Design a protein with these regions (language model features):
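Binuclear metal-ion centers of metallo-dependent hydrolases, dominated by the metallo-beta-lactamase
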Residues: 130, 134-142, 216-306
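Acidic/glycine-enriched edge-of-secondary-structure segments
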Residues: 45, 49-53, 74-82, 203-208, ...
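Conserved beta-strand hairpin/beta-sheet module of binuclear metal-dependent hydrolase folds
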Residues: 2-74, 165-168, 174, 198-209, ...
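Active-site neighborhood of divalent metal-dependent phosphoester bond hydrolases
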Residues: 102-104, 112-137, 278
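Metal-dependent catalytic neighborhoods of phosphoester/phosphodiester hydrolases
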Residues: 88-95, 121, 280-289
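Active-site neighborhood of phospho(di)ester-bond hydrolases with catalytic His/Asp-centered motifs
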Residues: 61-64, 73-84, 109, 207-212, ...
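Active-site-proximal loop/helix segment associated with metal-binding centers of metalloenzymes
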Residues: 45, 147-226, 230-235, 240
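Active-site metal-binding motif and surrounding structural segment of the metallo-beta-lactamase
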Residues: 62-108, 137
Length: 306
């Protein structure tokens, strides 16, 4: 895998169940949600565990307590080093080894790589097993190609310890306008003559923030996260018994801040995660149902566990 560098980065309050939102863009499934054509599963309860799984892309964001469904994913992206986001890492690797699956590839912020290596050293000593995996430090602005049609880039987030989010891009090669309509045989000849007949189109599909203050929305380097098809963003607090200022003290985001910056969010769908455990499911649902335009109808909640 090639890492590219670009010039262009918990103190968690401990709370997600299946969303009742049902429309053509976000349907509640028996397991997880289907949003904008992507199946999204997992659990995210602030201070307890966060793991968001995209099965069709064979990847997961953060590993929490290592829910069983996450074990099937080949690629794992860790946003930061707080226990509710990284605690299940050794179990994830060990379980894949138990099932004789391909050793996983794990991406972590550069600042925590050495600590993660020490975690595995300790578990190898205790468990007397290899815990095979590939560990890659991915810094803000760096990107990794997972396959020919898929790449991931790290972007800066704003938490109380080093943190970062990730953007998943689709890569497509589209025939240039001047060659559209040509016979297949002529297209074949052009290709064999090394003529560049396609344009590469890179599209941000999914952005995952992990834990962060709303400052990431105002960071001009994060524009792709704000125009990704789906933005998976923390919203630890959703009502006014805890203020936005309180949320910032813990390095988190309040739903009111997402409303405040709604005009900057070009995403087709927004999936809220990482709700405080203080909330009952109906409180979360009521907060989302009360959202004003332009958020109404395109915001969903990962509420497994509430």
């Amino acid at each position: 895998m090639e890492i590219k560098r670009e010039t262009s980065t918990s103190v968690s309050d401990p709370s997600p169940s299946k969303s009742k939102n049902k429309n053509s863009k976000g349907k509640a499934l028996k397991r997880g949600l289907n949003i904008e054509g992507y199946q999204i599963e997992g659990i995210s309860i602030a201070g307890h565990e966060t793991c968001v799984i995209i099965p069709t892309l064979n990847l997961a964001f953060d590993i929490g307590k290592c829910p069983q469904r996450a074990v099937s994913q080949q690629f794992l992206f860790i946003s930061h080093g707080h226990m509710d986001h990284i605690g299940g890492l050794p179990m994830y690797v060990a379980t894949r080894g138990l099932y004789r699956m391909t050793p996983p590839t794990i991406f972590v912020p550069k600042a925590v790589k050495e600590s993660v290596e020490k975690i595995f050293e300790a578990h190898r000593a205790m468990d007397q097993s290899e815990l095979k995996h590939t560990l890659i430090a991915l810094d803000v602005g760096e990107e990794i190609c997972l396959r020919k049609d898929l790449k991931v880039r790290a972007f800066k987030t704003y938490h109380v310890i080093p943190s970062q989010g990730y953007i998943v891009y689709s890569i497509k090669h589209k025939l240039k306008q001047e060659y559209i309509g040509l016979p297949a045989e002529e297209i074949k000849k052009l290709k064999s003559s090394c003529v560049e007949i396609t344009n590469t189109v890179t599209t941000p599909e999914i952005a995952f923030t992990g834990d962060t203050m709303s400052d990431f929305i105002l960071d001009n380097d994060n524009i792709d996260a704000l125009r990704a098809r789906i933005l998976i963003v923390e919203s630890t607090y959703v009502e006014e018994t805890v203020t936005a200022e309180n949320a910032r003290e813990y390095g988190h985001t309040h739903l009111s801040e997402i409303v405040k910056h709604a005009d900057r969010l070009e995403n087709k769908a927004i999936l809220l995660i990482h709700f405080s455990a203080r909330y009952q499911l109906d409180v979360i649902q009521e907060a989302i149902s009360a959202l004003p335009p332009p958020l109404a109808g395109r915001v969903f909640a990962l509420t497994e566990g509430f």
